[in-house]
Amino acid sequence: MLNVPSQAFPAPGSQQRVSSQGRSKVPLKQGRSLMDWIRLTKSGKDLTGLKGGLIEVTEEELKKHNKKEDCWICIRGFVYNVSPYMEYHPGGEDELMRAAGADGTDLFNEVHRWVNYESMLKECLVGRMAVKPAVPKDCHEGKRVLNGMLPKSQMSDTLPRDVTDTLPREDLSSPSYDWFQTESSVTIVVYTKQKNISLDSVIVDLQDDSLRAEAVIKDHSYLVHVGLSHEVQENFSVRVIENVGKIEIVLQKKESVSWQCLGDHLEKHDSFIPKKDTGLYYRRCQLISKEDVTHDTRLFCLMLPPSTHLQVPVGQHVYLKLSVTGAEIVKPYTPVSDSLLSDFKEPVLSPNKYICFLIKIYPAGLFTPELDRLQIGDFISVSGPEGDFKVSKLQEVEDLFLLAAGTGFTPMVTVLNYALSHMSSLRKVKLMFFNKTEDDIIWRCQLEKLALREKRFDVEFVLSAPSPEWNGKQGHISRALLSEFLQRSSENSRAFLCICGPTPFTDEGIRLLHDLNFSDDEIHGFTA
């Protein structure tokens, strides 16, 4: 599993976490940092062993290169010689060797499918696997599409073999799509065959007259991806009819002409595959504001393109991508609202058109200093949402407890906002916020104002290195602190807990919660 070195996230002791499976790191030798790897890739040294040539690699050839000093790995159809990278891999050589001489795509996806390996390993590229590519069908070939819909008998033929092999899951039916037009508009309709589809399950991008519409259905992704046959306006509308699971995307024509077909089918069009097997898609977003929140944490607000529909679900994260010294570096961050108080600051843009992040700047890091150097008006690439937190976990919850350390507070922002505005069963939501000093507390004033305004909300601050004037709680997460904090509103009330912070904080917190008789079903840990 190719885990590209990272200094900024999750750095040792970092508090900004995402929800995924954990992994172990091994100490790297001196001179084996990410910057050292980038310098090596730019040194001109032949890292492939092929003296600059690219080859087609058969399965038989790939299997031969399965030793530490001669290790080839296939990721998503491309073969890399990762022998030079062995000493730079923070997950250790043994992790890389698990995929030696084989297809490592699944192992790679288990941990860091978001890593931009194409950029990080481009100087190690040996070539492509010798696999006959699928021939894409367009609207002018063979089977004609009537209003975008094939007869059911032909539907399976349009899916790539690797897609049909994984579908359908027993409790999921493959979605389908149709389209129709008026003189001024084109409407694409996706039939998800699932109820309770919400707007944040739909991601739409219009780029250079190609339409990419993704519907996230449970743990699968359905994609409509076409090169439109005619030009359309960049503004469009998205509507979800939740009770029948129907999605409507309405495009406005630039010219009042009759379309003979929707357009040419592009990569993975009409596919329905597990979300973990999909690649990340990025769109360029513009930085519109940047303001200090604490001495080392800033609030970055980005504007989405007008031709994008993207709403990040509660408790989920996205990936930010920047070019650093010529290499593309990707880091995960959890979006937040621009304020905890609706009238604290009037938003300058529609909430559906901008996305904000609370990000701690690490002066010695690689990514965050580069991010901090961005000027208003500059652009940064933002992926679609990722993460396994579902608001369905909060159904009928009466007592919600949030445990956060440092910037582990970020996923709690949307959870807190959702709880206070959408949970009719909620009696109490309590936040215990751990920091080093008073100066490190993010949005302290807003949290205190919210507690005064909202009778269901309480916040407690805990400092590990307080000033002599501090009158609040002190120390680190402990059984004594949690026992006092985790008081239910009634003896049999339904409770749920979220915890996020540095890995040792989260691990210890979950252990203590188990000791206090909270079950796994009552706990969600945002861990890296």
Curated annotation (Swiss-Prot):
Keywords: Acetylation, Endoplasmic reticulum, FAD, Flavoprotein, Heme, Iron, Metal-binding, NAD, Oxidoreductase. FAD binds at residues 372-387, 399-431. GO terms for cellular component: cytoplasm; endoplasmic reticulum; perinuclear region of cytoplasm. Its EC number is 1.6.2.2. PROSITE patterns: CS, CYTOCHROME_B5_1, CYTOCHROME_B5_2, FAD_FR. Residues 54-130 form the Cytochrome b5 heme-binding domain. CDD domains: cyt_b5_reduct_like, p23_NCB5OR. SUPFAM superfamilies: Cytochrome b5-like heme/steroid binding domain (SSF55856), Ferredoxin reductase-like, C-terminal NADP-linked domain (SSF52343), HSP20-like chaperones (SSF49764), Riboflavin synthase domain-like (SSF63380). Pfam families: CS, Cyt-b5, FAD_binding_6, NAD_binding_1. Residues 280-392 form the FAD-binding FR-type domain. InterPro entries: Cbr1-like_FAD-bd_dom, CS_dom, Cyt_B5-like_heme/steroid-bd, Cyt_B5-like_heme/steroid_sf, Cyt_B5_heme-BS, Cytochrome_b5/Flavoprotein_Rdt, FAD-bd_FR_type, FNR_nucleotide-bd. Residues 172-263 form the CS domain. Residues 13-24 have a biased composition (Low complexity). Ubiquitously expressed. Isoform 2 is expressed in testis, brain, skeletal muscle and in the male germline. The keyword Acetylation applies. Residues 1-29 are annotated as: Disordered. One of its GO terms (molecular function) is metal ion binding. Disruption phenotype: Mice display insulin-deficient diabetes. Embryos and fetus develop normally. At 4 weeks of age, mice show have normal blood glucose levels but impaired glucose tolerance. Isolated islets have markedly impaired glucose- or arginine-stimulated insulin secretion. By 7 weeks of age, they develop severe hyperglycemia with markedly decreased serum insulin levels and nearly normal insulin tolerance. As the animals age, there is a progressive loss of beta cells in pancreatic islets, but there is no loss of alpha, delta, or PP cells. The modification N-acetylmethionine is found at residue 1. NADH-cytochrome b5 reductase involved in endoplasmic reticulum stress response pathway. Plays a critical role in protecting pancreatic beta-cells against oxidant stress, possibly by protecting the cell from excess buildup of reactive oxygen species (ROS). Belongs to the flavoprotein pyridine nucleotide cytochrome reductase family. This is Cytochrome b5 reductase 4. It comes from Mus musculus. The gene is Cyb5r4.
